[in-house]
Swiss-Prot record:
GO BP field: serine transport; threonine transport
Catalysed reaction equations from the record: L-serine(in) + Na(+)(in) = L-serine(out) + Na(+)(out); L-threonine(in) + Na(+)(in) = L-threonine(out) + Na(+)(out)
Bilayer topology annotation: Multi-pass membrane protein
Protein location: Cell inner membrane
Gene Ontology CC terms: plasma membrane
Protein name per its UniProtKB record: Serine/threonine transporter SstT
Keywords: Amino-acid transport, Cell inner membrane, Cell membrane, Membrane, Symport, Transmembrane, Transmembrane helix, Transport
SUPFAM superfamilies: Proton glutamate symport protein (SSF118215)
Transmembrane segments annotated in the record for this chain: 19-39, 61-81, 89-109, 148-168, 189-209, 223-243, 297-317, 325-345
One Gene Ontology MF term: neutral L-amino acid:sodium symporter activity
Domain of life of the source: Bacteria
Function: Involved in the import of serine and threonine into the cell, with the concomitant import of sodium (symport system).
Principal cellular location given in the protein's record: membrane
Amino acid sequence: MNTSRLFSLFFQGNLVKRIFIGLILGLLVALVTPTLQNVLGFNLAEKVGVLGTIFVRSLRAVAPILIFVLVMAAIANKKIGAKSNMKSIIVLYLLGTFLAALSAVIAGFLFPSEVALATKEDMTSAPQGVGQVLLTLVFNVVDNPLNALFKANFVGVLAWSIGLGLALRHASESTKTMVSDLAEAVSKIVYVIIAFAPIGVFGLVSETLADKGLVALGGYIHLLAVLVGTMLFVAFVVNPILVYWKIRRNPYPLVWTCVRESGLTAFFTRSSAANIPVNINLAKRLNLDEETYSVSIPLGATINMAGAAITVTILTLAAVHTLDIQISFFSALLLSVVASICACGASGVAGGSLLLIPLACSLFGVSDDVAAQMIGVGFIIGILQDSTETALNSSTDVLFTAAACIAEENKQV
């Protein structure tokens, strides 16, 4: 009975609660390891740390193929409405995502974060400036597609997935359906791996804290504060500026309504897709154009990913600072562009934004092993980070839709 209850605790129910339990158990193991080592004759934290290593290797294995099929399927099957103000909404979505990534770059430089990693590699090939980063980017783009998958060249994987996705837009419906089914199949594998996240976090926390000490928690707390702080800045400073640009009046009543009615629900559901009915209901109560919001809100749940762009950017810069890689601000600016593109592929996948971190890390020569460890760090702080990210993403969907609709009404008056 006890074994059955323990199994249910780790593999069923709310993922956030299970990760929190894994975090607490990992902390306890790290605390008791020095005492038990003399009794047991081995390092308990080191032994359970293998669980974290297996989890990280699983993430490394699935990330390249996930990005490849997900982006390809999304582009091949994308249908954008013909409404005149849809273009305005899409511009807001993409501009908002880019400005969120740019805000994250600035925050990453102003408040640099470092976290404890299992390995700190000697990064002798660290990029010297934006020129070298761009040259590396071009070389990675023209890589052989199979080699890109085998070597985890995420930029090459992204380039080929975009190219094939655009080509497949003209394919038959049966071919598009097959591509979508393939993406769904890979996503299901990801869900299985994510189900083991509590055990992975348990192993990672145990080994990290036993090795680095409780001081390692300070790095996690600082990183989380930078992430959440940047998301709040985007929600209450950047987004209102964009809304004012469209409607030319005080944006905060509308911003607050969207955060209260949509963001709060999304914070607890942790799913932009699950929050679509909430956003549609809010759009209806705001008397927005139904033909517009019925298309723009589901589309926003797919491509409007400001929170994901912030997560990818901040965690990538944390890896860069941890490894003491010197990069220019313009190189980091390129990161914000890549993070914006990456974020559009994060929708509908468990831990989607975290699984795109290796792609961004590859810009600066960070190994896929270290990048995978940053994914693990993301899961550790994900108890709060993921909820805040989803709240920002989902509330922005209805906010930008409302701004575009109001701007359209103002033109007609």
